[in-house]
């Protein structure tokens, strides 16, 4: 986990942005703590109501923050989309840190409330709530899948936002897990990590799937996807030892069975965070970034 956390936090920085930025916008209050999001506006608007890319950072549900938007891995995607008039949003959420009582369900609820906040204030920020693409990496990929697949009214958190519903028009997941109920999906000969190491993020204790199967199912996008779910793009490395390729294949196979719109791209020679694994990643990282932005653009085009 240390490597995963370091990659997700150490490369983050405040990006240079050509358009206007609106930082540290409080979208909800939890106890005495505000949860914040940043909005990066395009230099040139293409319409009165701009499409949105809503970014959810990774970090194992226990690390990271909205500043990962400015990492060298992510920023090119957002700059490409801003050139086409997208408003780019990066959201922070509560983290599953020891002793704080936060569970993965709280992470889902927070990022859901962030979307509800944007819908509530769509006129203020001149955005189109019907053209919102959700995007995340690793843990953020799972959260993006949950945003796309769970019903708009599910995972209500802030009572002031609960009546506001929003359904993303599409989602993009970079190496996000799809099913916590099947430990075999986390097993790989590439790592000696414990396959069920994320269970305590779901339940708050060391009990596995057998002790609380409903909680594990609830956090698994695999159990939420339906035929009419928003389109989803899955990008996954074939040598990922953190979130194995099996997760993307597993979700794609179910999508094929039920007729849901899921596209999958396997990146060869790529580990987690597109780290090189035995050769040059194919497609390359710049190509992955371009594929990601072009997919989002297609989903909001007439």
Residue ranges and their predicted role:
Residues 13-48:
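N-terminal cap/lid segment of alpha/beta-hydrolase-fold proteins
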Residues 14, 30, 182-224, 230:
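Mobile cap/lid helix-loop segments that gate and shape the active-site cleft of serine hydrolases
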Residues 113-187:
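Primarily recognizes the serine-hydrolase "nucleophile elbow" in alpha/beta-hydrolase
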Residues 241-250:
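Conserved alpha/beta-hydrolase "acid-adjacent" motif
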Residues 69-73, 77-78, 84, 89-129, ...:
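Catalytic nucleophile-loop/oxyanion-hole region of alpha/beta-hydrolase
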Residues 48-60:
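Short beta-strand element of the alpha/beta-hydrolase
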Residues 281-302:
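Catalytic active-site module of serine/aspartate enzymes centered on a nucleophile-bearing elbow/loop
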Residues 228, 234-236, 240:
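Short beta-strand/loop motif that positions the catalytic acidic residue
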């Amino acid at each position: 986990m240390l490597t995963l956390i370091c990659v997700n936090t150490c490369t983050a920085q405040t990006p240079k942005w050509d358009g206007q930025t609106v930082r540290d916008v409080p979208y909800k209050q939890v106890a005495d703590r505000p949860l914040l999001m940043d909005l990066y506006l395009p230099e040139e608007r293409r319409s009165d109501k701009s499409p949105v890319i809503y970014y959810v950072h990774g970090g194992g549900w226990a690390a990271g923050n909205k500043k990962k938007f400015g990492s060298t891995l992510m920023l090119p995607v957002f700059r490409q989309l801003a050139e086409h008039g997208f408003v780019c949003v990066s959201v922070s959420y509560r983290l599953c840190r020891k002793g704080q009582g936060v569970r993965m369900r709280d992470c889902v609820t927070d990022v859901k409330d962030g979307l509800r906040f944007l819908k509530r204030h769509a006129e203020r920020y001149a955005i189109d709530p019907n053209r919102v693409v959700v995007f995340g990496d690793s843990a953020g990929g799972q959260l993006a899948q949950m945003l796309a697949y769970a019903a708009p009214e599910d995972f209500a958190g802030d009572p002031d936002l609960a009546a506001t519903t929003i359904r993303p028009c599409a989602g993009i997941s970079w190496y996000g897990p799809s099913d916590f109920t099947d430990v075999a999906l986390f097993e790989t000969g590439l790592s000696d990590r414990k396959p069920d190491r994320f269970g305590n993020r779901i339940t708050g204790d060391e009990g596995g799937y057998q002790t609380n199967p409903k909680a594990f199912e609830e956090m698994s996008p695999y159990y939420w996807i339906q035929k009419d779910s928003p389109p989803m793009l899955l990008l996954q490395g074939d040598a990922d030892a953190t979130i194995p390729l099996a997760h993307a294949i597993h979700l794609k196979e179910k999508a094929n069975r039920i007729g849901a719109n899921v596209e999958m791209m396997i990146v060869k020679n790529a580990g987690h965070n597109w780290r090189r694994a035995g050769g040059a990643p194919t497609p390359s990282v710049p190509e992955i970034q371009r594929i990601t932005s072009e997919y989002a653009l297609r989903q909001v085009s007439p």
